[in-house]
Amino acid sequence: MSLLVIGINHTSASVDLREKVAFSPEKLTKALDELKNSDAIQSGVILSTCNRTEIYCEVKHGISSGYVINWLAEFHHVALETLMPSIYIHEEQAAVKHLMRVSCGLDSLVLGEPQILGQVKKAFADAREHNAVEGTIEKLFQQDFSVAKRVRTETNIGGNAVSVAYAACTLARQIFESLSDSTVLLVGAGETIELVAKHLDDSGCKRLIVANRTRERAMGLAEQFNAEVISLPEIPEHLPKADIIISSTASPLPIIGKGMVESALKLRKHQPMLFVDIAVPRDIEGEVAELNDAYLYSVDDLQSIIDHNIEQRKIEAIQAEAIVSEESAEFMTWIRSRQAVNSIRQYRENSEAMRIELLQKSMQALASGQNPEKVLAELSNKLTNKLIHAPTLAMQQAAKNGETEKLTVIRTTIGLDN
């Protein structure tokens, strides 16, 4: 058996090709059934995300990566010549190491991102549900999850914000001790604000107000995160309630001005307000930063935080890579020891079968009245010849082919050079 990974990802393939070989839930079910029933594949897991499609499998002896690549191309009706330039292949320890790097976020578009581990776990769960995993692959994925946990525990690779939305929420958490006690006003209802709302919700934010030009779009966020919805003209009325204001609209002019904030601060009795403006052009007048108790951060401020955090993640990645190298080597040691156990068991079974076969013939000879000494001598001769037959042939072949190292190994194995 051999461990194998074949796949494409965001660095090797275009979005168009990644879409063509992605596995929808319906396709995944069919694909896992095909893998399970294949004569060439012992066990397999399919990982399919927007950034990668990968097949992790244990293939039977003599099966090459070409078999799995051909299967992938045929399954998705993609020409092999279209697929091949974007395919990468990892075997044995390289396959183990690749899976661990993927799960730890070391191979992600955003270095250290944690979402990929959940996607790997789901891919494994789907394969188990379809009885497509067993043996080495099952052990590999279980070990992989332990390694990912170790990397998250022993390094800070996922602890620094590297997206604008996440950086905005991280900033809010740093300034306000508990988001569960803070009111957040989100201005806008686009994709970035939706991500901000999700991060805030994950951080325990309980009071959320969404202000948007159209209420319909904002209502979707409100239902998802139990938020209050207001229109843009209603912002001055609700601004004094907000401790944190995060804004991202496509407005050509500022929505929140210095005077509006000044009035809100008076009504709040100058309790601090955090303004995070991630819009371009800006939604919040720059003069707001001149006010006492108003703290304004722009998208440029966040970008400098993100750039710093990316560098920090790169430093943490060095330690993470070392952990992955160590753990992948340990897993291969386990595989080799397992292979040795299987070989020893098979050798013992074969030897025992020889012994029983010859013993039965000898017992029959004794029962028929043959000379016991002659029967025992014949038994010992035949048993010796059968046991030395395979190593004798191997030594003859090695000598004939000039394979000195192989001959030395055989001699050591059978105790001639001990």
Swiss-Prot record:
Residues that coordinate or bind NADP(+): G188, A189, G190, E191, T192, I193
A GO BP annotation: protoporphyrinogen IX biosynthetic process from glutamate
Reaction equation(s) it catalyzes: (S)-4-amino-5-oxopentanoate + tRNA(Glu) + NADP(+) = L-glutamyl-tRNA(Glu) + NADPH + H(+)
Residue positions binding substrate: T49, C50, N51, R52, S108, E113, P114, Q115, Q119
Pathway: Porphyrin-containing compound metabolism; protoporphyrin-IX biosynthesis; 5-aminolevulinate from L-glutamyl-tRNA(Glu): step 1/2
Molecular function GO labels: glutamyl-tRNA reductase activity; NADP binding
CDD domains: NAD_bind_Glutamyl_tRNA_reduct
Residues the UniProt record annotates as site (Important for activity): H98
Keyword Repeat: no
Protein keywords: NADP, Oxidoreductase, Porphyrin biosynthesis
InterPro entries for the chain: 4pyrrol_synth_GluRdtase (IPR000343), 4pyrrol_synth_GluRdtase_dimer (IPR015896), 4pyrrol_synth_GluRdtase_N (IPR015895), GluRdtase_CS (IPR018214), GluRdtase_dimer_dom_sf (IPR036453), GluRdtase_N_sf (IPR036343), NAD(P)-bd_dom_sf (IPR036291), Shikm_DH/Glu-tRNA_Rdtase (IPR006151)
Residues annotated as catalytic: C50 (nucleophile)
Enzyme class, spelled out: oxidoreductase
Entry domain remark: Possesses an unusual extended V-shaped dimeric structure with each monomer consisting of three distinct domains arranged along a curved 'spinal' alpha-helix. The N-terminal catalytic domain specifically recognizes the glutamate moiety of the substrate. The second domain is the NADPH-binding domain, and the third C-terminal domain is responsible for dimerization.
Quaternary structure, from the entry: Homodimer.
UniProt xrefs under NCBIfam families: hemA
Extra facts: During catalysis, the active site Cys acts as a nucleophile attacking the alpha-carbonyl group of tRNA-bound glutamate with the formation of a thioester intermediate between enzyme and glutamate, and the concomitant release of tRNA(Glu). The thioester intermediate is finally reduced by direct hydride transfer from NADPH, to form the product GSA.
Purpose: Catalyzes the NADPH-dependent reduction of glutamyl-tRNA(Glu) to glutamate 1-semialdehyde (GSA).
Name assigned to this protein: Glutamyl-tRNA reductase
Organism: Aliivibrio fischeri (strain ATCC 700601 / ES114) (Vibrio fischeri)
